[in-house]
From Swiss-Prot:
GO terms for biological process: epoxygenase P450 pathway; ketone metabolic process; steroid metabolic process; xenobiotic catabolic process; xenobiotic metabolic process. Belongs to the cytochrome P450 family. It is found in: Endoplasmic reticulum membrane; Microsome membrane. It is a peripheral membrane protein. It holds the Pfam family p450. This is Cytochrome P450 2B6. Its EC number is 1.14.13.-. The modification Phosphoserine is found at residue 128. Changing residue 391 to N: In allele CYP2B6*15.
Length: 491
């Protein structure tokens, strides 16, 4: 090796050592954690299997509250339902800020209900919750919308005549159509090419965010953003979806009837008109598009992915599917469509759906938060704007609440008498002020779609149950189930 190269390496090593020695600890009162290197943070201590595995390993050493440096920035990690509840419920206001997901932040930039903060978030959340409730309780309730969509699904599955299929885009279609009926005022045919294109962009984006590159980008986005990578594809995908939404908004402008708004976009446009003289109004074009995109994305990917996990688990554990079917026969019968009030009489089915959500662990690290003020927490001081990760997976896999946390077992949610048993550690929708605003719709979709399919079809796989692999294909921000083939066989 040339002398000049050796001298350069020696100089670089010396500089790094000097930085480590002189690196001022500006976060002396943050929770403890592995010692970071300048710029690199805790990169060298990370588990190559991903961020979640790294955080779980750090928890073993530092407990339920600790600090990890993702690149140069400190992030406080909260594990276990007690710490998560203490933050999100007992100190709800302080922990109500929204952090950033590096792969999508350049696109959203704090707009839309999911990534907004401060007054903008309060205005958009209040509007979204109220409008979704109003359109879900009018002439056609959310339950009726889901029941109608479920019947469309049954017709589509019958057309398959028991052929092998990948259910990904069909499950996306049914969940997307529910949110589309509320936001856009219409549903789409399952073969609509523009609709399928949007769903493919959502699927690809969620997968890329959850990929190994997505996790690496979370650490070093300030550097990696200047180079080619999956982040650019994510930005392009979101631009394309946003363009479609913008086109839909213009169509709504042309047909808007102020006396009879037909969906969420119409209602938003009326708010814009009402507040057009207010220079500080949050009812802007940008918030309209990105709020719509946020609801469209969240209302599609999360529930459809849970359904995909659910039917993969039914293939893996056919005795569970058979027991659910027996309960459907007993309570509903073979002909009447399932209704939400049936849930109270179907504890086993409800337990299975809860266990699917718990086991699939769809957002294992939650969605990042920030503290809105200097906050005292368990003897530590968390400075304002510090990021906080709520590791929901540690609640959903807590052995104190779930006897066999790594196994799929509906008995986790049943008491000794077979009645439904709820537990405070079951928090797939998170907690507090940022709890998923679509929780009610998602729970209704899961029950009605799941039971309607099992009422009408049995399932078969080309793979023996014992050979079905449940290992996720990606596990980052989201947990993506493996692709699989399934037959839906009419009963």
């Amino acid at each position: 090796m040339e002398l000049s190269v050796l001298l350069f390496l020696a100089l670089l090593t010396g500089l790094l050592l000097l930085l480590v020695q002189r690196h001022p600890n500006t976060h002396d009162r943050l929770p403890p954690g592995p010692r970071p290197l300048p710029l690199l943070g805790n990169l060298l201590q990370m588990d190559r299997r991903g961020l979640l595995k790294s955080f779980l390993r750090f928890r073993e050493k530092y407990g339920d509250v600790f600090t990890v440096h993702l690149g140069p920035r400190p992030v406080v990690m909260l594990c276990g339902v007690e710490a998560i509840r203490e933050a999100l419920v007992d100190k709800a206001e302080a922990f109500s800020g929204r952090g950033k997901i590096a792969m999508v932040d350049p696109f959203f930039r704090g707009y839309g209900v999911i990534f907004a903060n401060g007054n903008r978030w309060k205005v958009l959340r209040r509007f979204s919750v109220t409008t979704m409730r109003d359109f879900g309780m009018g002439k056609r309730s959310v339950e009726e919308r889901i029941q109608e969509e479920a019947q469309c699904l049954i017709e589509e599955l019958r057309k398959s005549k028991g052929a092998l299929m990948d259910p990904t885009f069909l499950f996306q279609s049914i969940t997307a159509n529910i949110i589309c009926s509320i936001v856009f005022g219409k549903r789409f045919h399952y073969q609509d090419q523009e609709f399928l294109k949007m769903l493919n962009l959502f699927y690809q984006t969620f997968s890329l965010i959850s990929s190994v590159f997505g996790q690496l980008f979370e650490l070093f986005s300030g550097f990696l953003k200047y180079f080619p990578g999956a982040h650019r594809q994510v930005y392009k995908n979101l631009q394309e979806i946003n363009a479609y939404i913008g086109h839909s908004v213009e169509k709504h402008r042309e047909t808007l009837d102020p006396s009879a708004p037909k969906d969420l976009i119409d209602t938003y446009l009326l708010h814009m008109e009402k507040e057009k003289s207010n220079a500080h109004s949050e009812f802007s074009h940008q918030n309209l598009n990105l709020n719509t995109l946020s609801l469209f994305f969240a209302g599609t990917e999360t529930t459809s992915t849970t359904l995909r996990y659910g039917f993969l688990l039914m293939l893996k554990y056919p005795h569970v599917a058979e027991r659910v079917y027996r309960e459907i026969e007993q309570v509903i019968g073979p002909h009447r469509p399932p209704e939400l009030h049936d849930r109270a009489k179907m504890p086993y089915t409800e337990a299975v759906i809860y266990e699917i959500q718990r086991f699939s662990d769809l957002l294992p690290m939650g969605v990042p938060h920030i503290v809105t003020q200097h906050t005292s927490f368990r003897g530590y001081i968390i400075p304002k704007d510090t990021e906080v990760f709520l590791i929901l997976s540690t609640a959903l896999h807590d052995p104190h609440y779930f006897e066999k946390p790594d196994a799929f077992n509906p008995d986790h949610f049943l008491d000794a008498n077979g009645a439904l048993k709820k537990t405070e550690a079951f928090i797939p929708f998170s907690l507090g002020k940022r709890i998923c605003l679509g929780e009610g719709i998602a729970r209704a979709e899961l029950f009605l779609f799941f039971t309607t399919i099992l009422q009408n079809f049995s399932m078969a796989s080309p793979v023996a149950p014992e050979d079905i692999d449940l290992t996720p294909q990606e596990c980052g921000v989201g947990k993506i189930p493996p692709t699989y083939q399934i037959r839906f066989l009419p009963r």
